[in-house]
């Protein structure tokens, strides 16, 4: 096991031992899925959109997850308030710019949150990351039309410009701080046909941010997803059985197997 892999191993182990409270402002489609995933890996999720609660909640939460999947004017206001409060309290947050590039509102919302509040990690698919880096690319709703390798330079640019870590999901996941690049292999072809897999990656990134620096947190989350996804696919006949097996595999996670999936 390399030094990097040992760091991933220890970070996941620490997250499980600390069971951090993760405040999620996520989308309505995946809320139950991501809450169950966080519980399965050992974290403690809370889902609240109410601005009046943020001061109290972010005083006890270890990290914040902001996911723009189901945007409304009310949710946009809540996201800005949550990020502002998190910054004030030094609570790290991860942003998932779901569907950036699909509509002007989504793109603007994501860019505003990045520029104004400096997320520790931006986690998205290749198309979303390329759009946020200023590249012109057609998107297909919330799904990517680009492969992860196409987005590497965009990810580096975005990371350097905003002093953040960019995590790009694909057949091989790429994580970069603008200089260092990490690769995570594994997962399953059944993951893209299950709603919420990217959002789950972001939620687990939030859990890992509670105990790790942003680069290790982002890589650890993708290692967890890759390991659980690959193992679940071997026990599944299709998307429905995979969804159940995936949560089970998160719960039974082989930390050693997960950590060994990362390389530089």
From Swiss-Prot:
ATP binds at residues 123, 169. It holds the Pfam family HK. Substrate binds at residues 47, 196. It comes from the Bacteria. It is an enzyme of class 2 (transferase). This is Hydroxyethylthiazole kinase. Signal peptide: none annotated. Its cofactor is Mg(2+). The keyword Kinase applies. Keywords: ATP-binding, Kinase, Magnesium, Metal-binding, Nucleotide-binding, Thiamine biosynthesis, Transferase. Catalyzes the phosphorylation of the hydroxyl group of 4-methyl-5-beta-hydroxyethylthiazole (THZ). Belongs to the Thz kinase family. Pathway: Cofactor biosynthesis; thiamine diphosphate biosynthesis; 4-methyl-5-(2-phosphoethyl)-thiazole from 5-(2-hydroxyethyl)-4-methylthiazole: step 1/1. The keyword Metal-binding applies. Its EC number is 2.7.1.50. GO terms for molecular function: ATP binding; ATP-dependent NAD(P)H-hydrate dehydratase activity; hydroxyethylthiazole kinase activity; magnesium ion binding. It comes from Brachyspira hyodysenteriae (strain ATCC 49526 / WA1).
